[in-house]
Curated annotation (Swiss-Prot):
Annotated gene: smc
Family named by the database record: Belongs to the SMC family.
Pfam families in the cross-refs: SMC_N
GO biological process, one term: chromosome condensation
Origin species: Cereibacter sphaeroides (strain ATCC 17029 / ATH 2.4.9) (Rhodobacter sphaeroides)
Free-text domain note: Contains large globular domains required for ATP hydrolysis at each terminus and a third globular domain forming a flexible hinge near the middle of the molecule. These domains are separated by coiled-coil structures.
GO MF annotations in UniProt: ATP binding; ATP hydrolysis activity; DNA binding
Name of the molecule in the record: Chromosome partition protein Smc
InterPro entries for this protein: P-loop_NTPase, RecF/RecN/SMC_N, SMC, SMC_prok
Ranges annotated as biased composition (Basic and acidic residues): 421-438, 465-480, 866-889
Coiled-coil boundaries: 170-218, 342-379, 407-508, 633-994
Stated role: Required for chromosome condensation and partitioning.
Membrane-spanning parts: none
Record PANTHER family: STRUCTURAL MAINTENANCE OF CHROMOSOMES PROTEIN 3
Superkingdom, natural source: Bacteria
Amino acid sequence: MRFTRLRLNGFKSFVDPTDLVIHEGLTGVVGPNGCGKSNLLEALRWVMGENRPTAMRGAGMEDVIFAGAATRPARNFAEVALVLDNADRLAPAGFNDADTIEIVRRITRDAGSAYKANTKDVRARDIQMLFADASTGAHSPALVRQGQISELINAKPKARRRILEEAAGISGLYQRRHEAELRLAATEQNLARVEDVLDQLAQQLSTLARQAKQAARYREIGEELRRAEGSLLYRRWREADLARTEALAILRERMTAAGQAEAAARKAAGARAEAEATLPPKREEEAIAGAVLQRLTVERDTLAAEEDRARATIATLVSRVDQLGRDIEREAGLNRDAAETIGRLEWEREALETAHEGHEERLAEAAEAAREAGAALGEREEILSERTEDAARLSARHQSAQRMLVDSRTTLARSEAEAARARETVEAAAEAQERAAETWEEAAAAQEEAQERAEAAEEALVQADEARAEAQSREAEARAQRSAAEGEANALRAEVAALARLVDREAQAGSQLLDRIQVEPGFEAALGAALSDDLRAPEVAADAPSGWAALPDYDETAPLPAGAEPLAPHVGVPEVLRRRIGQIGLVGREAGAALQPLLQPGQRLVSIEGDLWRWDGFRAGAEDAPSAAALRLKQLNRLVALKRDLEEVAARAEGARQAHEALQARLAQLTRADQEAREARRAADARVTEASRAAARAEADRSISGGKLESARLAVKRYEDEAMEARARLREAEGVASALPDLEAARAGLEDLKMAVEAARIAMMSRRSLHDELRREGEARVKRRQEVTKDLSGWKHRLETAEKRSAELAERKAETEEALREAAEAPEEIAARREELAEAIEAAEERRARASDALASAEAALRAAQEAEREAERQAGESREARARAEARADAATEALQLAAERIREETERTPQQLLEALAVDPERIPTVEALETDVGRLKRQREALGAVNLRAEEDAQAVQTEHDTLKAEKTDLEEAVKKLRAGIQGLNREGRERLLTAFEQVNASFGTLFTHLFGGGEARLVMVESDDPLEAGLEIMCQPPGKKLSTLSLLSGGEQTLTALALIFAVFLANPAPICVLDEVDAPLDDANVTRFCDLLDEMTRRTETRFLIITHHAVTMARMDRLFGVTMAEQGVSQLVSVDLKRAEALVA
């Protein structure tokens, strides 16, 4: 399978439909930071089945949906499509029915993800297995994101094993083994459950036999129990009938006594009311005296608090003076310490300068010695290189001579055999050429017909796209209008509901008049000021104690003052308020005070703002808190206006909804038409592709057959010539092999020269180490001298600052001592004020005592009256309770009688008389309830002693036996399934080990070669560690760049680590090439020279594999080596766009 196209729609910053074409070779992606380049890699991983939100750099999977920008609304879905070329038909069986496979993943808010393969719904598991079998997938090492190279470098050996698994192509094998292990565990669990059930069924069979014997005894006890229970029911009914007769007689006596007690209670209540009338004046006097005393007491407590604050201030100032003295002493000590530190630092600076003298001369001498040792080493290495090349050439000549001998003999035998086969091929190729010419003519005609149909389908698709785009635009506008209208309607509904709840909560029981009044908007404050909380009273009858009673109109109504208009035309009130509302006039705020003296009794004036002027001289301004009645009237008017507005907005929202739904239906219809057109276009393209492929195959077959015929003729001549040449080369190789010098003597001389070179290298390294040590010592002294100079400057600055601080502390101490002298005068003033308050408090206490004595006498008289009332009420209450108990007893007796009769009907479906006839006994001879209950209890205990009795024991036993036999057969099947699953898992493990070891050898060999290519020398290899089982072992990387010792990957430099990791990734490609490789800014740590090596390696990979590379980069060298470039831009804030340039075509055009 080959990846050909990646399509994004609404995925992260790619809000518009965007296609990324993936051709053969190197495809580059460039653009500024933050413009969305890495979103392309994440889209590719997402469509291949990635389900971790963190891998998508999000908190939840819905974060991949475009979230909106300044000029773009948020999307409700995101979709990514991946087009695969399956012309080779290498896909799994479920996907291998077409030359092109289109994998689509779509996510919708609050609905989750859905996968489709060529428009058919599939599972995420199927998609993951499809890519796993193709040696790729969401977690493939071939998809290298930013930072993943570092993760590979820092990974533990077992984590690196996943790279080897990808090379072996066993990712899918691991998943299948895991599924088999899950099925094995489930099967073993089912087998255990079946064995448990079989044991339970065996126990049930033995239990059922015992239960059958209990059934007969159970029936006998049941008959006796039914007769005893019937007698008990009748006996209880008869006793309940006698108890009811007695209870009715007692009730009549209690009702007479209760009436007499209630009359005495009413008389005591009148006496208590007279005593209560004398209390209010005495309580008022006592409250006034208490308030005066309280005010004076508060003043005394305040004065005491002031005295405490004054004393606290004095103590604070004294403490502050002491603290400032200590601070001055501390600053003096710090000044002495700073002077000592400055002296010590100056001595150390002089010592460092003395030690540094002569350093440069010693360093130059060591450098010269290191250079001389290096020159000597270079001379010996040059000699070694020449001798090594001579020995290699001699070894190569020996090997070449031997290979020539073997190759000549092999070529002679092969050429003679191939010449004979080529003569046979000439005859078969001539016949095949005639058949291929006929097939090509038929395929060309079919291709022309399919092309005409594809052009017609393309035109229909263009028309459907235009219609759908227009409908989508109109639907978006209608959706916005509907959303706005519904939002306004919802806001009004919420306000109406809140205001309605507030109005309903304030409504009082008894139908207050306030709820029956209608006021013109703007006049609520005027009516509320005129009537205030009187409007909360209900309308009542003429004899009611409180409320609005209806009265006839006045015989003659006094007119309102000139300049005042009646308020009545602006309000609608019930009939009961006509007298009151007719006495209210409406005036301007400036005229009210002037007209108030002209008011007649009962009249009042109000302003529209809420001011009030009454006939008796009272007036209230609108700036006072408005009355509750005025607020409620405004709420009622506001509620009416809101409901009217809500009806209009709701009608408008309903119209917008209908229009939006109509456009939605139209858009759905056009979308279906567009989809059908796309399907038709896709089908036509598929037919064109199939016809083109058939024509191409026919043309290729014709060309191939012609070529085969010509090749076969040439092969006959070539193989005959090769046989003659092979005989001549064989004679020549035998002569060359006998004339070569001795190879072993040359190798021995070369080993001696290597030992001399190694001794020179050790001497050079020693001199270099001495030079480096001198240089480090000099740098350390310079650094310490700079630090000492810096510290010396700092301590001098501290000394100057400390002197200024000491002067400031002395000044603050003088100011604090002055404040202390002023604070010491306050306690004497407070003592004089305390004496004056003591005299006033003594007078107030005498007044309060007199008022309290008078109030106590009145309250004692009231308590006596209340005690008498309570006693009368107690007796009345006891009489009422006795009456209630008698009533309850009578009701209970009646209810008990009814319940007894009802229970008889429920349990026997008979009346009491019918039950007595059924029992056939004399009522007087029926035993007592206690005796019958004893018999019933005894029979129940006997029945309960039998326990649970299964009356269907024999039928149950047969059913259990049948189930037991069925489960035994199922147990045999499960045991067989467990054996098969275990054998399958063992087979998968065996296959995985074999494929993993094979891949290890291939990857290890390729890794060493690529490492040497990238570094220009050196060596590297892979090592399995931590386990003898390849499936559990870790993978360690051992490498030796040129001029360094063999070490692990973690000990290399950053650039070397990156090149080594890339060599490993590409070695995996050579073992099991993935269809696609994405490298996200892997060249960032590399310099220009290493980037050039990296690009050379990419070119080599494109030649040796069919992998298609997608390179995300910022490096100019990498960009220049790409076959084509895609640029990701963000001209519109938050929205990514894709532009492309084909560099190969551009070079061709320039040429």
